[in-house]
Amino acid sequence: MILQALCEYYDRMAALGKMPSFGREWKGIPYLIVIDDKGNFVKLESTEEDVDGKKRAKQFCLPHGKGRSGKNSWAVAQSLWDHTGYVLALPKKMNYEDKKAIVTGQKQNASFIAEVRRIASLNEHDKGILAILSFYGKFEENMKRIKTDSLFEQLTKNDGTNVAFRLIEEETPIGADTSIALGDEETEDTGLCLVTGKRLPIAVINSKVNIKNGGTTPKLVSFQKGSGFDSYHKQQGLNAPISVQADYAYTTALNTLLAPKSRNHFFFNNDTIVFWADKDNQLEDDFSFFFSMPPKDDPNRNVEAISNLMKAPWTGTVNDQTKGNFYLLVLSPNNARIAVKLWEETTIQQMAGNLRDYFSDLDIVHSSKCRAYVPLIPLLKSVALQEDLKNLPPALFQEMVRSAIEGLPLPRLAQQHCLQRIKAEPHPKSAETERCRAALLKAYLNRLHDNQNKQLTMALDVENKNQAYLCGRLFAILERIQELAQGDLNATIKDRYYGSFSRTPNLVMARLVDLSNHHLAKLSKGQQVYFERMKGQVMESINAAGLPAHFSLDDQSRFAIGYYHQRQEFFKKKEEQLETK
């Protein structure tokens, strides 16, 4: 289903002219060898541009790259472009004392020239290709001039730098001319394609995917020779037959989705998250903002995207009634292969509804300093040690995304990490962090399928008689009394007693209630009456004798939300506060 969905995406985008035709791809070429129509070298030209502070090679629509690997990879040359070993016979690291590297460069160059001749035989009157052949007819002379060019040192700074040829009077590389006939590669291997269901030439080696941290030749589909996974003596790609056309379609689609300027992917640690829809929809444009960090040049973009989603039923901003599918793919690359960690296929309408429910479940009263909605990354940062995402289990992100998209309960692992951080950091760095933790616990509890308790509300619920929730409220009241009685403190009862009160309230409740009586004596008469009444109203609903010896993790979560709700009630605007000064 993954490959079929990618092929369908390619077909749709190619029909709109947004993807290259079969046999071509968008390729970054950092340097061009400029020649005249006689094949004489003119100059080296850099195409690199400054994009977001980084140098990026200009993209050209060139003949699609061929897969190559193993000790005979030198024999496979790309069509009209390749790295400096193939195009200029340069040895690795420019080490002319390494005889093996010199021979390899020469063999690569011979393969490239043979490929140019093959294409020239199909395009006998093409001026550009004939100029390349003429260039190699006077190769030694041209190489002497290339080595004196001011950009030569920069060109050879890194191995594997791709280059192509450009005629001096043209603006694009010679290979960018789509009228050039490339000729289909002959293959003896034909079979039933698993993607299209048609009998076609099979790709023995699938094309590589340009993914971050993916090494040199990462592939989504690959087989190692003689690895023990060969069926019926079939080698490599013949074990899972995918046609050359389908291989081209799915890799072109995936590489387009992964392109630097594409908004159809984002990153989480070493994972790459790719998504797309089979019909144009605002949800596809906004999807990454639901889960990623906001862009530096538009810090409110995430909140705007979520706000549009939440208002969509009334405003029509996000047309979630579109009858189409939405796809999500989480990939984790290594040196040679790409692991699929998560694959989601759902309808646009269903996913929009599930996402709306997800953000509604996360909605909780908060300070005016906090953002209106919480994207996933800030949420996860709030429960990570030192707010570093690398300190979280890799699977947590995938499970959170899956919960949001499918409308499932949140992973218990998220609850556990959240409670750990609350106990380890009684006073979080910011109101946003505190809000995120409370929001996560509220969403976790309300989405439990077997939750027999009252649903937790966005703000303080005085009708909620859950014992853990009431204990949390009581603890917040006792802490507030202490703060008003003793002024600014380096530490409050929260620093010393939060962990024990939230786990085993019976052990410390009586002691803290007695302590609060001493604190009440230091308040004004009006404050004493107000807090005595508030404390009494909560305590009369707590069955002290019936409290469990230990609160479960779910009840510890209710305690945390009760505490948070009550604290937020205290810190409303002055005109809404009931405290008597």
List where the protein language model places each region.
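Cys/His-enriched microdomains
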Residues: 191
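Short, non-ligating residues that shape and space the ligands of small metal-coordination modules
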Residues: 199-203
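Conserved phosphate-interacting/catalytic interface
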Residues: 1-188, 229-581
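Short microdomains enriched in Cys/His and/or Lys/Arg
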Residues: 204-242
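Short Cys/His-rich metal-coordination motifs, predominantly Zn2+-binding knuckles/fingers
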Residues: 196
